[in-house]
Amino acid sequence: MNVSTAGKWSGPALAVLGLLVAGAMALTPAAGRSTLIWWILSSALAPERVLPLIGLGAALALVDRRYSLGALALFGGGVAVGFFGKDWLLSVLAAIPRATSHHFLTGPISSVTVGVALVLPTARLRSWFLLIAAALAGCMLAIAIAVTDPSLHDVAIPLAGVVVGFWIVVAISLTVRTFWRTWFPIPARILGSWLVAIGLLYGGASLIPKQKSAFPLPAESTPNIIPFPGPDRLSPEFQPHERPGAVIPPADLQQP
């Protein structure tokens, strides 16, 4: 196997290798999982995190290699900006209503931006917008890693999140290039429209406040007591009877 053949199949090999590692993590007994493995399975590989990265990888395969490498570099730069400018970015995103309870809407923002890059009609417009989408997706990935990090100080978790993100983008991009067909832009636009729709629906649902119940709940201090019916409302078998004993005779029968 020569170098060109090995490079051609590097994408599928990278994808299979990553899937095997993820499968081994998923098969690990829950009691034996470390914090890192638990975080990778529950956060780094969460659908809202993976879908925009899959779309970004597909978008990189649709453009010229020069733009693809530039977008990948901007993706890495966006990750760095997201980590070092985390406090400022969080303060900006916190202005969005209810963003703090939905990971600062990092998933919807990435999905919509990458989806737009996929559905743009012309290759030139797609290539230029992809640079912006890649940088923004990198920023959102870094913010998502920071706000879901349970350790707060363990370097392994942010590093693993970045590695997983780059693995998804690069593996998808190289695999699509390996099996490239001229009709690939059609399903890519369908994927982009799905990402835009998912991002808008999820983001819109996150902005809607929870509706209060139309029926007020009873106060806890008010006991639910059913009054016991009086004697006149009891059935005959439950009516009170006089106790047996001496009975006073009528006055006309009493002896003097």
Predicted feature locations:
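Membrane metalloprotein/metal-transporter helix-bundle signature
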Residues: 1-251
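Short, solvent-exposed mixed-charge patches
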Residues: 254-256
